[in-house]
Structure formats: C-alpha cells, structure tokens
Amino acid sequence: NFPSMGEIIPEYYLKINSSDLVTLLKRTVFCILNDSQKLEYTGAQFTVNRDILEISATGMQRVAIASVKFDTEYSNDFTVNIPKKTVSEIIRVFEHRNLIEIETDRRQISFKADNITVYSKLIEKFVKNIDRLFMADKYPVKAKIDRKSFIEASKRVSAITSEETPG
C-alpha cells in the first residue's frame, strides 16, 4: 500500500482524450530539465485558457509549446506545473486509454482513466511568460529556406561544436 497524499478538493477539472494529452506531452517532455536549481524548469506547465490547453516546457536553452483546442469552454482558467517523472508516467500509463479526467487544486493533481489513477504533487513555481517568446502577432517571423542547404549548414556547425560548447 502507498501512503495517502491527502484528498484533492478539486478547484479545477478537465476532461481530455488520452491520445491528445499524450501527444502534447511527447512534444514537450524533451525540454524538461532533470535536475536544476530552478525548480520551475523541472516540470511541464499546463495552462487552460477557456477552450485551449497549452503545455509548455523549457530547459533554458530549449522551449517547447504544444496546445489543443476543446469543443467546450472551461469557466476557470488555471496554470499548474507537473513534475517530469509524473509526465513520463502519464505518457506510459495513459497512452492507450479513452478519456482522462484531470482534477487539481493548488498543491496536487490527479489523472484518472478507467480504473487507473495517477496522483502527483505539483511544482509550486512557474516559468513566467514563456508565450512572450513567441509573439507571432506582434513580431511575425517567417523564413523560406532550401531544405538541403539547411541540413548541410547544420552538419557543418555540428562538426565544430561539442558538448562543452555553450549555446
């Protein structure tokens, strides 16, 4: 038996298709740091804003943001930061399920599907303003480049950089 984490009195509730959630997590998990002095970089940030779930992660040098739009609107917007180990477990356990019910308060979160429930504590710090890095409406960035030339340039750069090279 596992120790009880305490009852979650849900402040926020969300229902999502498991394949959508797992896809979003797979698109962001590679940016989550394993160990960091800054705790907020060791998790995936879930932000619900009306009818959109956005999951973002950053490892200071990399940033990943993935989102999905819901058919229904949720009345309460919220942001929570979920530890990397929990993200990995969600991907592993819920990949081939139907709907996942997510309940959270300010300290912990639960993911439920069928007869499986995953509980986790939340990271209490957030990475602020990740979305400001990509202000496409204010600063549109578009580039059209030759794929072959880009791959060749990438290979040349990788030949002169190493693991010790910053940036």
Regions found by a protein language model. Give the residues of each.
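Structural preference for solvent-exposed beta-strand-turn elements
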Residues: 1-167
